[in-house]
Amino acid sequence: MAAMASFDWADPLGLDEQLNDEERMIRDAARGFAQSVLQPRVIDDFAAEADASELFPLMGEAGLLGVTVPEEYGGAGASYVSYGLVAREIERVDSGYRSMASVQSSLVMY
């Protein structure tokens, strides 16, 4: 009988081993921001139906907006995988915050 494959509930798709060092660094920074800045306020923002526009400068300072925009235009010049990782970490807290970041990151490209 074959041995059972191990399963990692924290990383069920084995994503972490597929990331390069830069992608891990960006993911970890996004996770830190999401947990320290977004998580503490999400329930109050949701209850107040607040737009939380004061988060845009904070997200920008943290490098979470325009992740794929080239550095010469003020972005990080990172990969689309990195952008997806940032979105995933923000989404982990709230889809509304992720929508805010995604829209702003997309609008800057045009």
Regions found by a protein language model. Give the residues of each.
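Internal helix-loop-helix
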Residues: 61-110
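Generic non-transmembrane alpha-helical segments
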Residues: 32-37, 58, 62, 89
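Intrinsic disorder at enzyme termini
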Residues: 1-22
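Short secondary-structure junction/hinge motifs that connect adjacent elements
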Residues: 40-61
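Mature N-terminal segment immediately following signal peptide/propeptide cleavage
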Residues: 18-37
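A structural motif shared across PLP-dependent enzymes of the aminotransferase-like
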Residues: 27, 50-54, 75-83
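Residue-level recognition of alpha-helical structural elements
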Residues: 19, 48-52, 97
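A generic secondary-structure micro-motif detector
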Residues: 20, 44-46, 76
